Amino acid sequence: MVAIVGFLMIIVIVFLLLRGLMSPIVVLAMIPSIAALILGYDPVTIGGFIKKGVETTMGNGILFIFSVIYFGILSDTGFFDVIVNFLVKKAGNNVIAITVATAVVATIAHLDGTTAATVLITVPSFYPVYKKMNISPKILLCLTGGCMGVMNLLPWGGPTARAATVLEMDATTLWHMLIPLQIIGLIINFVLAVLLGMLAVKQGAGMGKGVEDEVDEKATAEAEALRKPAPYLVFNLILTVALIGILASGIVSSYIVFMIGLCIILAVNYPNQKLQDKLIKKNAPAALIISATLFAAGAMVGIFEGTGMLTAMAQALMSIIPAPLGRYIHVIFGILALPLGLCVGTDAYFYGIMPLVMKVGETYGVASLSTALTMIIGKN
């Protein structure tokens, strides 16, 4: 009975998230609660499960709030625009330099971990250049996507934070295990940028009129008013590098790093209290939605474990999975991660499928951490 309710709950969660019928926050908190009620647990007990689960996500949720607002304000200062314009000008009419610059910008732009910001910074800036230089826009999308996949492994990136929530561990601790792979991924992306640039030259790129000296977006008056001069941008660069360095060292909790970092960047760049409030309100919605989703996922994980649904489902799957295959279940799902993620969506993949695969893997001697790392890497 417990396993059946668990499987039905997973199916409903995946269906609702895949069809976009409800907000992930509602789905992840409400559906498991209903499943627990069906299993006979009273509201007080369910509340205890939820409390325990949410407590494990607290650090990661707070990290998201401060990191997303920090990078949003960093973007408001014109930090990313300056980097884009500088690299485009330096690349000139050199096709390979343009593709490498694309990879650099996409990598830096995805420091905030949000897809929308990366695409809005990278694609509009480089698409006119690609068009004039007769470079296939597929290369632009390929490089942007590749760099986003690698940078998604940052602790405030969606996949790492979601997996850390399921593992009930700090996202920064999980990221430390992924740093070597992330470095290799960045190197591969830049090598790929060079190779795609060479391929574009063979296909006739660079035969256009060339890029113009000025590649500037038509920014609104409000955005222009927020832009800061060079000395501030240098300070912002040093601050950001310092924050990431402290995170990599692991000497301070990640959310504390960004909490202090946010205070510093606001105090230095925008010392006016009203303007500070305005910028926080501007960037807060995205941060709060992500954090609320993490807390809701924590509620789901708490109910999963408290009711024993996860264990019951794993035992049911063990009865139909051949033992020799079970030892490699993490590898199998690592290979299937990309198409599976595309089919069911990110939240359903990490909060619906990953916990079950981890539990099944445990019964065959595969550590949950190994399964999670494999599924994160495969997904990105």
Where are these regions (language model features)?
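Structural signature of hydrophobic alpha-helical transmembrane segments
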Residues: M1-G6, M58-F66, T114-V119, P180-I183, ...
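Interfacial loop-to-helix junctions that mark the boundaries of transmembrane helices
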Residues: M1-V2, R19, F49-G59, A171-P180, ...
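Long, contiguous bundles of hydrophobic transmembrane helices that form the permeation core
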Residues: I4-F7, L39, H176-L279
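Hydrophobic alpha-helical transmembrane segments
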Residues: A3-L8, V26-A29, G61, I96-A101, ...
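Membrane-core helix-loop-helix motifs of multi-pass transport proteins
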Residues: P128-V215, A221-R227, V366-N380
